[in-house]
Amino acid sequence: MGVTKKPDLNDPVLRAKLAKGMGHNYYGEPAWPNDLLYIFPVVILGTIACNVGLAVLEPSMIGEPADPFATPLEILPEWYFFPVFQILRTVPNKLLGVLLMVSVPAGLLTVPFLENVNKFQNPFRRPVATTVFLIGTAAALWLGIGATLPIDKSLTLGLF
């Protein structure tokens, strides 16, 4: 942990600078009105102009039209729904699968209350939150990769 050096307010050079208004906030320019009125709108409008320009010049293709007579063998959701899809696919009771899905955000909501006595922001000094994050990330990756495989290899990822 570093040592913070406090200014010596009895130093005559520092007192002279503070008297002139040259304190810690002397360098730079203020955010109001320069940034908020002039720079931010230019950046926002420039970003919108780039997006509109790319959409006009290079429109993305929607894809081939749907054929109701050619249904794929296995319908997969979007990639960000793979872990949830895997839970619903592997749990035999659908009500239990829905309860498992609801328990994930409910469990995440309890983590701040478990560590409310710990005021550190460093993740290595917050073991409960770090453990929940690491286990949750590993489980989401495991379920997400398993959702892309056939049902008989989905839980073992074809490794065992």
Curated annotation (Swiss-Prot):
Subunit field text: The 4 large subunits of the cytochrome b6-f complex are cytochrome b6, subunit IV (17 kDa polypeptide, petD), cytochrome f and the Rieske protein, while the 4 small subunits are petG, petL, petM and petN. The complex functions as a dimer.
The organism's place on the tree of life at top rank: Eukaryota
GO CC annotation terms, alphabetical: chloroplast; chloroplast thylakoid; chloroplast thylakoid membrane; plastid; thylakoid
Name of this chain's protein: Cytochrome b6-f complex subunit 4
Family membership noted in the UniProt record: Belongs to the cytochrome b family. PetD subfamily.
Gene3D superfamilies, alphabetized: plastocyanin oxidoreductase (1.10.287.980), Single helix bin (1.20.5.510)
Organism annotation: Arabidopsis thaliana
Membrane association type: Multi-pass membrane protein
GO biological process: photosynthetic electron transport chain
Role of this protein: Component of the cytochrome b6-f complex, which mediates electron transfer between photosystem II (PSII) and photosystem I (PSI), cyclic electron flow around PSI, and state transitions.
Protein encoded by which gene: petD
TM region(s), chain numbering: 36-56, 95-115, 131-151
Pfam families the record matches: Cytochrom_B_C
PROSITE patterns xref list: CYTB_CTER
Keywords, alphabetical: Chloroplast, Electron transport, Membrane, Photosynthesis, Plastid, Thylakoid, Transmembrane, Transmembrane helix, Transport
A GO molecular function held by the record: electron transporter, transferring electrons within cytochrome b6/f complex of photosystem II activity
Alphabetized InterPro entries for the sequence: Cyt_b/b6_C (IPR005798), Cyt_b/b6_C_sf (IPR036150), Cyt_b6/f_cplx_suIV (IPR005870), Cytochrome_b_C_euk/bac (IPR048260)
Location(s) in or outside the cell: Plastid, Chloroplast thylakoid membrane
